[in-house]
UniProtKB/Swiss-Prot annotation:
<dbReference type="Pfam" id="PF00293">
    <property type="entry name" value="NUDIX"/>
</dbReference>
<dbReference type="GO" id="GO:0008893">
    <property type="term" value="F:guanosine-3',5'-bis(diphosphate) 3'-diphosphatase activity"/>
</dbReference>
<comment type="function">
    <text>Accelerates the degradation of transcripts by removing pyrophosphate from the 5'-end of triphosphorylated RNA, leading to a more labile monophosphorylated state that can stimulate subsequent ribonuclease cleavage.</text>
</comment>
<dbReference type="InterPro" id="IPR000086">
    <property type="entry name" value="NUDIX_hydrolase_dom"/>
</dbReference>
<protein>
    <recommendedName>
        <fullName>RNA pyrophosphohydrolase</fullName>
        <ecNumber>3.6.1.-</ecNumber>
    </recommendedName>
</protein>
<dbReference type="GO" id="GO:0006753">
    <property type="term" value="P:nucleoside phosphate metabolic process"/>
</dbReference>
<dbReference type="GO" id="GO:0019693">
    <property type="term" value="P:ribose phosphate metabolic process"/>
</dbReference>
<feature type="short sequence motif" description="Nudix box">
    <location>
        <begin position="45"/>
        <end position="66"/>
    </location>
</feature>
<feature type="domain" description="Nudix hydrolase">
    <location>
        <begin position="8"/>
        <end position="153"/>
    </location>
</feature>
<dbReference type="InterPro" id="IPR022927">
    <property type="entry name" value="RppH"/>
</dbReference>
<keyword id="KW-0378">Hydrolase</keyword>
<dbReference type="GO" id="GO:0034432">
    <property type="term" value="F:bis(5'-adenosyl)-pentaphosphatase activity"/>
</dbReference>
<dbReference type="InterPro" id="IPR020084">
    <property type="entry name" value="NUDIX_hydrolase_CS"/>
</dbReference>
<dbReference type="InterPro" id="IPR015797">
    <property type="entry name" value="NUDIX_hydrolase-like_dom_sf"/>
</dbReference>
<comment type="similarity">
    <text>Belongs to the Nudix hydrolase family. RppH subfamily.</text>
</comment>
Amino acid sequence: MTGATALPYRSNVGAALFSRAGKILVARRADLGPDAAYQWQLPQGGIDGDEDPAAAVLRELDEEIGTTAVELLGEIPEWLSYDFPPDVVAKFGARHRGQRQRWFALRFLGTDDMIRLDAHAHPEFDEWRWTELSSIPALAVPFKRPIYERLARDFARFAKTDGA
């Protein structure tokens, strides 16, 4: 192995957060600016040391959207991974070739005003919205798109469209 392929994957978790109406939360990355392409994503973040992935996803939700008013619906039982493009590897100091992720489906139990992007000192997101699960692959940066396509398939049962 040479170059980026010799680097390890960074372990992290992702949250597919569904409203009671079956929509999924997407948030706009604050560091890319409002006019950037593919600036919307699902909450995700690193696993600290030997932290349990289920605990990590709750911590990440608190850090990124200011709430843990959720219930676990399901998870993808295996690790999903993607490789960063070369410019992203370089941007992060060539420490990781990409990310390996555990994805969780969760139901939001609170009200929209409980989602607070400014709950912590350095917000990752500057805007959020509820959207259709089927729309998330088109919102994702191309290197994450296969993961979001998998989420749209595997978590479709949590995306009720009857307005309930």
